[in-house]
């Protein structure tokens, strides 16, 4: 089976900053890391992710971008459809639990630019259940995404590059890794 390169992205933040780490893997092997910072509860996550991917030496080799949700840095929403359009790399959001959209919408109402944030949530598309995880996709079908998710797993149900990105991001912010991706 051909080994694909995947980019997994996760964040960690405190009251001062939010770091976003990307981990590039091929098979079970870590090939490199990407890094950027975003505003907590801001609206710059999409632009920063696109820029991070575009400047990467791995860009042409990445088969798929994995995210653990459409939010980073609190409520800094990622427009996954735009990330796909501007990088030409499919995006798969992998979640352990289906989000409560009423609760999510209620929390977003407390932030500036509610209508823009709501639009980003809407264009992220339908949430699909695959086994014991939930996914959203940009640039590929749910069944294609399922194959890529399965190819990216080493242990558990979260793509390995997302898990590693989580560990690195939390170590940068907290001095050691914490929690689960």
Swiss-Prot record:
InterPro entries hit by this protein: Endo_dU (IPR002802)
Domain of life: Archaea
Alphabetical list of Pfam families matching this protein: DUF99
Stated family: Belongs to the UPF0215 family.
Protein name as catalogued: UPF0215 protein AF_1433
Native species: Archaeoglobus fulgidus (strain ATCC 49558 / DSM 4304 / JCM 9628 / NBRC 100126 / VC-16)
């Amino acid at each position: 089976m051909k080994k694909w390169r995947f980019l997994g992205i996760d964040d960690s933040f405190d009251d001062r900053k939010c770091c976003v780490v990307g981990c590039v893997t091929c098979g079970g092997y870590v090939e490199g890391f990407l890094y950027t910072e975003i505003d907590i509860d801001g609206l710059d996550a999409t632009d920063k992710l696109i820029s991070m991917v575009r400047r990467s030496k791995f860009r042409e080799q990445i088969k798929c971008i994995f995210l653990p949700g459409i939010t980073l840095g609190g409520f800094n929403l990622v427009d996954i459809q735009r990330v796909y359009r501007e990088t030409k790399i499919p995006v798969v959001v992998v979640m352990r639990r289906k989000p409560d959209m009423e609760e999510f919408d209620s929390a977003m109402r407390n932030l500036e630019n509610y209508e823009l944030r709501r639009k980003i949530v809407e264009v992220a598309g339908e949430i699909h259940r695959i086994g014991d995880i939930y996914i959203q996709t940009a640039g590929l079908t749910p069944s294609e995404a399922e194959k890529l998710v399965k190819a990216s797993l080493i242990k558990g149900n979260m793509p390995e590059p997302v898990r590693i990105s989580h560990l690195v991001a939390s170590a940068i912010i907290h001095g050691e890794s914490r929690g689960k991706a």
